[in-house]
Amino acid sequence: ETEGSEWAKDLSSRIIAIAGMKLNEANPLVRAWTEGFSRVVIYPSRSLNSVENSSVSEEEKKAEEAKAKKINFAAMRAMDACKKRGEVILVFPAGTRYRPGRPETKRGLREIDSYLRLFDIMILVSNNGNCLRFNPEDTENMLRDLVCKDEKILCASPVIDCKTFRNDVLSKLPADDPDPKQKTVDKVMEILEAQHDEIEKIRNVHEYF
């Protein structure tokens, strides 16, 4: 917010991040860091799926589903208000950090299609390099992440018209496609991966200390 051209400072001041509920509930210290950013809290489908696949009772699962719907309905209203105020939404389409050996963490979440319908334009930003890596002994505990030296490169796509992008993807699908919304998100992830792979060719990769 203090460096760069005036337009960049203005853009930075308008960014509202989408934060999964885990960042608010997992740990008081993680929550304290999260609260340093302007954000809208959502209940990611990946989190709900983990509850549905667990051993909790059906009553608890239904209660969690109701909680998720309530949180996400409020989140969509909040994002619509952000749009009307001229703010920019920052969202990680996979809903989590990629975990090597777990390809499902690299797949975009189906609900990202809702963002494509809600907003007018988007920029896809890929992030090469990682200074904060999973601890292989405890990949679910963010407080045990490993701080590492690395070269980070951020790369942004051209501005993309959301409606045109979405319609183009849908127009190429068969009429009986079982999940067209997921296909639009898959295309987003395809572009991000290609962008990432291209930058990786010129990046100096650093290993752990």
Please give the residue ranges for each predicted region.
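A cross-family acyltransferase "interaction/gating" segment
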Residues: 85-175, 206
